[in-house]
């Protein structure tokens, strides 16, 4: 079925590792990162009573599905060409999904890319914030030299709209 095919594609994120290590010393998967930012959206729903936090949670769950096709490329190494390739492959896959999922995902991805709504801004802030938290939880011996400086500022602009998220990032 179309549903099983879509789930099979998404299952690839379980085996797609990210740059960051877990506190247990192994590489984190993209699926784990997506799960945790969705959990963060659930935990923080009362911090943003005017926002549609169910939509934020959906954004968090789907935000890295493009990495099913390209793998994870760390933010510090991702080029405009990498982003373009990932987006093209993702949108091609989304177009193959059954309706109404196809339309909802396309709408969510467009909103996430524009970063104009509060929901998109919250999702993006949580995405960056989770990466900072994950790095802080991992053994510092797993860090690359350039990450020490990057960790000091990564995601600051994304959380600046929210005093709560700014404080959490500190």
Pin down the residues of each PLM region.
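Active-site helical microenvironments for divalent-metal-assisted chemistry
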Residues: 1-170
């Amino acid at each position: 079925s179309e549903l099983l095919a879509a789930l099979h594609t998404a299952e690839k994120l379980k085996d797609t590792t990210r740059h960051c290590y877990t506190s247990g010393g192994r590489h984190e998967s993209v699926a784990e990162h997506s799960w945790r930012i969705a959990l963060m959206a659930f935990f923080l729903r009362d911090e943003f009573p005017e926002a549609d936090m169910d939509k934020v949670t959906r954004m968090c769950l789907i935000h890295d599905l493009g990495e099913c096709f390209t793998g994870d490329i760390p933010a510090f190494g991702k080029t405009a060409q990498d982003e373009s390739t990932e987006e093209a492959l993702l949108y091609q896959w989304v177009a193959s999904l059954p309706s109404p999922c196809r339309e909802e995902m396309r709408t969510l991805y467009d909103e996430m890319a524009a970063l104009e709504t509060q929901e998109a801004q919250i999702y993006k802030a949580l995405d960056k914030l989770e990466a900072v938290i994950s790095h802080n939880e991992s053994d510092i011996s797993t860090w690359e030299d350039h990450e020490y400086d990057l960790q000091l500022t990564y995601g600051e602009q994304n959380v600046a709209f929210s005093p709560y998220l700014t404080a959490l990032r500190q």
